[in-house]
Amino acid sequence: DGDLHVRSQVSSRTELGQLSDSFDHMIAKTAELMDERLRSEEQKRKSEWKALQAQIQPHFLYNTLDSIIWMSHAGRNAEVVEMTSALALLLRSSIGDGSDTNTLKKEIAHVRSYLTIQKMRYNEKLRYEIDLDPQTEDCLLPKLILQPLVENAIYHGIKVKQQGGTVRIESLLEEDRLLITVEDDGVGMTPEQLETILDKKESDAESTKIGVYNVNERLQLFFGPDAVMKYYSTPGVRTMVMLVLPIVRGKEEDSHAED
């Protein structure tokens, strides 16, 4: 009846007894594997929920709506339309269609909407560049995986730099791996800061760090140990995060995120 806690009652050391021991071992191993799978699925669900929570923080939404109201009062109608459209696309791609994956092309469309809003809020202090290799567009990623990395670059690199700076996103194929980099020419990070950025305990106190830790966790759940996320930084010069991932191809089902 599917009861994995059942055990055979044979106690003899005969061949039948050995068979009974093998049966017990097989049942115990099966139960262990099922428990491990359940734990993994639960961890995956929790990670995905945290990811959705991290995408659109209330303060970001409030600030964006405040900016829209302020621009409307100032008669900057074209900018109101642009920011409202970007926010609508951002919300739509965050809610999505129930899938837990996106093509890189859709991920970049989501990030572009986010950057459009942030650039309008910070004016000339924030610039961005996106260089996407066409051969990487249909590569699959866990959904909403790039925004936390871009957000971290803005808030810990560009925002705190007096003259602002540029966020650059790039993708390319290298042998059998997909490489994605998010780089900023902001204030950089010290070796001590780099050590804490992927530390769960340290991340619990700060939303952007929670997002970065969650990115790494979800990459491991999706790709396994072949997924690598590395941070490089020079204080006062730049910070770069590099994702080195297995290539998993998907289909571009629709283009709504880029209308």
Please report, for each region that a protein language model flagged, where it lies by residue.
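Two-component histidine phosphotransfer core
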Residues: D1-I56, F60-Y232, R238-V244
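Intrinsically disordered, low-complexity acidic/proline-/asparagine-rich linker or regulatory tail/stalk regions
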Residues: E253-D259
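Short, charged/polar, Gly/Pro-enriched secondary-structure boundary elements
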Residues: M26, V248-E252
